[in-house]
């Protein structure tokens, strides 16, 4: 069982899944924080 887990973690498939996960998390972070960042900028310059 441990050998199968290590094979899955060391294989090409893991790299593909990790790359897709990191791309998705980056998109969520950028598009999730961008509206808040714009809100802060607008509030900073209007006061």
Curated annotation (Swiss-Prot):
Key word Transmembrane present = yes
Q: How does it sit in the membrane?
A: Single-pass membrane protein
Cellular component terms (Gene Ontology):
plasma membrane
- Mind listing the UniProt keywords for this protein, alphabetically? Cell membrane, Membrane, Transmembrane, Transmembrane helix
Annotated membrane-spanning segments are 28-45
Primary site of residence: membrane
Q: Where in the cell is it found?
A: Cell membrane
Task: Report the superkingdom from the record.
Answer: Bacteria
Name the record gives this protein: Uncharacterized membrane protein YoyF
Question: Gene encoding this chain?
Answer: yoyF
